[in-house]
């Protein structure tokens, strides 16, 4: 998945807390994680996505991921909902 796919998605969950909630409720199709995010921030998302067998896609930049989501700040994680 690329930034372009995120920017074209119609149903996104932005941020680590919201991504974790969506994963718990099994509403997630794919998870996008920025490589420059702090490991302590994204570890739970990675673990839960792995357990639930949700594909994880890595992108280079939190700032670019946030911009692709239409926000002016960086985003560590984004989930595409089913």
Curated annotation (Swiss-Prot):
It comes from the Bacteria. It comes from Halalkalibacterium halodurans (strain ATCC BAA-125 / DSM 18197 / FERM 7344 / JCM 9153 / C-125) (Bacillus halodurans). Pfam families: Ribosomal_L7Ae. This is RNA-binding protein BH0128. One of its GO terms (molecular function) is RNA binding. Gene3D superfamilies: 3.30.1330.30. Keywords: RNA-binding. Disulfide bonds: none annotated.
